[in-house]
């Protein structure tokens, strides 16, 4: 059996194909706003944005659990022993 590597596609006349008309605009475009609504830009005051305005509270509970926990080391050794036929 012989299979052709090229897939046969029907030939289309490009003169008969027309582009779709774009949807009509409901309003005339007056300007482009970047960064949100115009209500936010009209506020007065000293707002700090970016890295300087970012406040992050540190959670020490994760660091304490890692420092005080030798449970993972014990767990690994028990798994290793059980894999080689030893007791837990």
UniProtKB/Swiss-Prot annotation:
Protein name: Protein 6.7
Compositional bias ranges of the Basic and acidic residues kind: 54-63
Gene Ontology cellular component list: T=7 icosahedral viral capsid
Location in or out of the cell: Virion
InterPro entries referenced in this protein's UniProt entry, alphabetically: Phage_T7-like_6.7
Coiled coil, from the record: none
Phosphoprotein is among the record's keywords: no
Taxonomic classification: Viruses, Duplodnaviria, Heunggongvirae, Uroviricota, Caudoviricetes
Pfam families in alphabetical order: T7-like_gp67
Keywords: Virion
Ranges where the record places region Disordered: 1-88
Purpose of the protein: Plays a role in virion morphogenesis, and is ejected from the infecting particle into the bacterial cell.
Organism superkingdom: Viruses
């Amino acid at each position: 059996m012989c299979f052709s590597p090229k897939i046969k596609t029907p030939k289309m006349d490009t003169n008969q194909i027309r582009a779709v008309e774009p949807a009509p605009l409901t309003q005339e475009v007056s300007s482009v706003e970047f960064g949100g609504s115009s209500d936010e830009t009209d506020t007065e005051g000293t707002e700090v944005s970016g890295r300087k305005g970012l406040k992050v509270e540190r959670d020490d509970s994760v660091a304490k659990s890692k420092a005080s926990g030798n449970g993972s080391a014990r767990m690994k050794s028990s798994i290793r022993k059980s894999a080689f036929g030893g007791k837990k």
